């Protein structure tokens, strides 16, 4: 958690002619949101797509699988306004609530010069697959549904 944005910045600096997207959860982006400032300051045109569900999604998913859905310390509920935060650092910010707005906003954000942050509201029940449990090998990955 928290690795995606700095890694995307490095990729964009290394390959400035390429379009670089980073997909991040809202919990992950909060771990390094200060990195939005250098995007603007140094003209690093990364497009940041935030899947915003007010949870630490990886933690929730692990608690689903291995702790019988006994959730603790994984809800954010901080009323954060990520597009406003991005704007305060010179990065264009967007917010998507409705599925119908997804493609028009993505087209606009991808076409804009410079960095952009697209904050997409998703359900707290969304999960990310595949996932590899800690300490396990790729052959132990979970492709969806319940843990093996």
Model-derived regions: residue spans:
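Thiamine diphosphate
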Residues: 1-148
């Amino acid at each position: 958690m928290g690795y995606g944005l700095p890694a995307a910045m490095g990729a964009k600096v290394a390959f400035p002619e390429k379009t670089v997207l980073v997909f991040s959860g809202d919990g992950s982006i909060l771990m390094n949101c200060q990195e939005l400032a250098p995007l603007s300051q140094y003209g690093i045109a990364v497009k940041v797509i935030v899947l915003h569900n007010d949870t630490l999604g990886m933690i929730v998913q692990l608690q689903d699988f291995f702790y019988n859905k006994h959730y603790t310390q994984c809800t954010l509920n901080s009323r954060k306004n990520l597009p406003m935060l991005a704007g305060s650092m010179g990065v264009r910010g967007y917010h998507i609530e409705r599925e119908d707005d997804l493609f028009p906003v993505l087209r606009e954000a991808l076409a804009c010069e410079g960095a952009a942050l697209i904050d997409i509201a998703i359900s707290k029940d969304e999960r990310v697959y595949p996932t590899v449990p800690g300490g396990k090998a790729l052959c132990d990955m979970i492709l969806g549904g319940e843990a093996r």
